C-alpha cells in the first residue's frame, strides 16, 4: 500500500481544513504563440490560472495534481503552423514560487500529474481508501477567479451527489480558477478533483470519478518512481507524454 493512500480518522473541521490548506497550489500558465507567414510573424501571449495540490513529496520535489485541461497544449490545425511554448508557475500557500512540468495527463477524465522541483517539506493530501456516498459532506479548497493571497485561500463545504457516466457530481460553489482543486471527505482525504462547473448554476460541479482518480495517481506514481533514478525531470516529461492514458 502506498503512503499516499490514507486510513485516518475524522478530526474537527478546523483541524482538517487547517492541515489540508497547507497542500494547496496556485497555478499560473503562460502560453506564447507564434505564427509566421507572408513575410511576417505574429506573437501572442495567453495567461490563465488554476488550482492544484500536493499528492506526494520527495527529498527533491513534489508531485501535484490539477485538471488536465490546464495542462493541455493542443492547438487547432491551421494552414500556417503555430509554434507554442507553455510554462507553468506554481505558488505554495505561503507564497513561494516554483516551476512545474507536466508528467502525465488524462484529457478524457480531466486529471493531470505535475512535478514541482524544489518544493519540499510540505504536507500532502492523502487519498481516501473508500469512495464517497451520496449525501456525504465534502470540502473544497481552491482559488475561484484567482482569489488567493499568501496564507489565504478560499475553503468551501458541500455535498457529494453521486456519479453518472464519467463524472462525479458535487454541490459546491466554483468559478474559473477552481479547476484542479481538491475535493476532500470529512477526514481530509481526497475523493475528487474539481474540473468543471455548470455555467448557469455554478453551485454544482464535476470531478473525475473516485476510482479513476485513485488508479491514475497510483499508476503514474509507479511510473515516475520507476524512471526517476535514471532520468532527469525533463526527460521524464517526454516519457510520460508517450504513455498518456
Region roles according to the model:
Residues 11-14, 35-67, 98, 180, ...:
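A conserved glycine-rich beta-strand in the N-terminal activation segment of trypsin-fold
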Residues 7-9:
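N-terminal Sec signal peptide cleavage junction
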Residues 47-49, 55-107:
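Catalytic-histidine neighborhood of serine endopeptidases
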Residues 30-32, 57-59, 67-71, 93-96, ...:
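Solvent-exposed coil/turn segments that connect beta secondary-structure elements
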Residues 18-40, 138-140:
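A short, Trp-centered hydrophobic/proline-enriched beta-strand micro-motif
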Residues 11-17, 85, 122, 190-245:
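C-terminal cap/linker of serine protease catalytic domains
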Residues 12-15, 122-178, 194-205:
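Flexible, gly/ser-rich surface segments that form the specificity/activation loops bordering the active-site cleft
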Residues 53, 173-194:
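Catalytic nucleophile loop of clan PA
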Amino acid at each position: 500500500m502506498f503512503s499516499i493512500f490514507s486510513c485516518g480518522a475524522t478530526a474537527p473541521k478546523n483541524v482538517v481544513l487547517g492541515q489540508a490548506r497547507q497542500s494547496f497550489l496556485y497555478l499560473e500558465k503562460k502560453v506564447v504563440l507564434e505564427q509566421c507567414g507572408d513575410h511576417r510573424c505574429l506573437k501572442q501571449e495567453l495567461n490563465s490560472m488554476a488550482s492544484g495540490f500536493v499528492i506526494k513529496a520527495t527529498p527533491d520535489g513534489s508531485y501535484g495534481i490539477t485538471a488536465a485541461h490546464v495542462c493541455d497544449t493542443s492547438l487547432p490545425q491551421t494552414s500556417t503552423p503555430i509554434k507554442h511554448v507553455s510554462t507553468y508557475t506554481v505558488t505554495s500557500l505561503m507564497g513561494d514560487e516554483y516551476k512545474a512540468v507536466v508528467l502525465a495527463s488524462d484529457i478524457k477524465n480531466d486529471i493531470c500529474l505535475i512535478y514541482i522541483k524544489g518544493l519540499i517539506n510540505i504536507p500532502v493530501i492523502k487519498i481516501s481508501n473508500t469512495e464517497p456516498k451520496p449525501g456525504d459532506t465534502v470540502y473544497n479548497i481552491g482559488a475561484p477567479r484567482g482569489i488567493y493571497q499568501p496564507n489565504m485561500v478560499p475553503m468551501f463545504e458541500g455535498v457529494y451527489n453521486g456519479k453518472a457516466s464519467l463524472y462525479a457530481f458535487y454541490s459546491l460553489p466554483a468559478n474559473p480558477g477552481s479547476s484542479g482543486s481538491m475535493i476532500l471527505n470529512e477526514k481530509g482525504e481526497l475523493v475528487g478533483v474539481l474540473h468543471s462547473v455548470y455555467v448557469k448554476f455554478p453551485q454544482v460541479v464535476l470531478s473525475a470519478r473516485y476510482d479513476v482518480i485513485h488508479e491514475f495517481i497510483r499508476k503514474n506514481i509507479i511510473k515516475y518512481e520507476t524512471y526517476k533514478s535514471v532520468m532527469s525531470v525533463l526527460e521524464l516529461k517526454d516519457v510520460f507524454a508517450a504513455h498518456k492514458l
